[in-house]
Amino acid sequence: MNIFDRKINFDALLKFSHITPSTQQHLKKVYASFALCMFVAAAGAYVHVVTHFIQAGLLSALGSLILMIWLMATPHSHETEQKRLGLLAGFAFLTGVGLGPALEFCITVNPSILPTAFMGTAMIFTCFTLSALYARRRSYLFLGGILMSALSLLLLSSLGNVFFGSIWLFQANLYVGLVVMCGFVLFDTQLIIEKAEHGDQDYIWHCIDLFLDFITLFRKLMMILAMNEKDKKKEKK
């Protein structure tokens, strides 16, 4: 029997029998909204980097924060769905604008960093998402406390580094932060499943969690690649 003649059953690979059909439909809405956020964020980044019509700064950061709070304060219902999708799109757009300075920095170092970082982030996000979907339910929820503690330590060290100015601490924050965000992809994905199983159908807010995970992963991986590229250029000189 030739093992190469065996057919791969893709339906079996995509079958999540431990997740109820209603939750699977909920996840489809979450990831459809996530895809929308990615396109709108790309448009926001384009506006900052290419057209310079809207620049990243205090106003764009405050705008994204206000939209996020507004979205949180607006209850999920059929009547408010279109309004909340508009708020989600606005938040994603301003988040993309906020990526502008980091994108410009990477372009000055080496433009090839951007597609490399995006593809790397997409692969990491996809792998950890599938791991969370295929794993036994609630198996990664124990990470919540660990991840929040690690995030608090990263925030404190980042604030402390404002005064110390240590490049080593900055780099350590990037690498540790990358690992922590991978953990958040696992945790948030399974948390969304559990919330949906218990009746929480707010797919728009659930999308926010995954979108922020992806953006933070992308930003950290992009900066790691840019700093490594700068170090290589210094060594050549």
Curated annotation (Swiss-Prot):
GO terms for molecular function: enzyme binding. GO terms for cellular component: endoplasmic reticulum membrane; mitochondrial membrane. The chain crosses the membrane at residues 30-50, 53-73, 87-107, 113-133, 140-160, 167-187. The keyword Lipid metabolism does not apply. Its main location: endoplasmic reticulum. It comes from the Eukaryota. CDD domains: BI-1. Belongs to the BI1 family. Interacts with BCL2 and BCL2L1. Interacts with ERN1. Endoplasmic reticulum (ER)-resident protein that confers cellular protection as an anti-apoptotic protein by limiting multiple stress-inducing pathways surrounding the endoplasmic reticulum and mitochondria. Inhibits the activities of the key sensor for the endoplasmic reticulum unfolded protein response IRE1alpha/ERN1 both directly and by blocking BAX/BAK binding. Modulates ER calcium homeostasis by acting as a calcium-leak channel. Negatively regulates autophagy and autophagosome formation, especially during periods of nutrient deprivation, and reduces cell survival during starvation. This is Bax inhibitor 1.
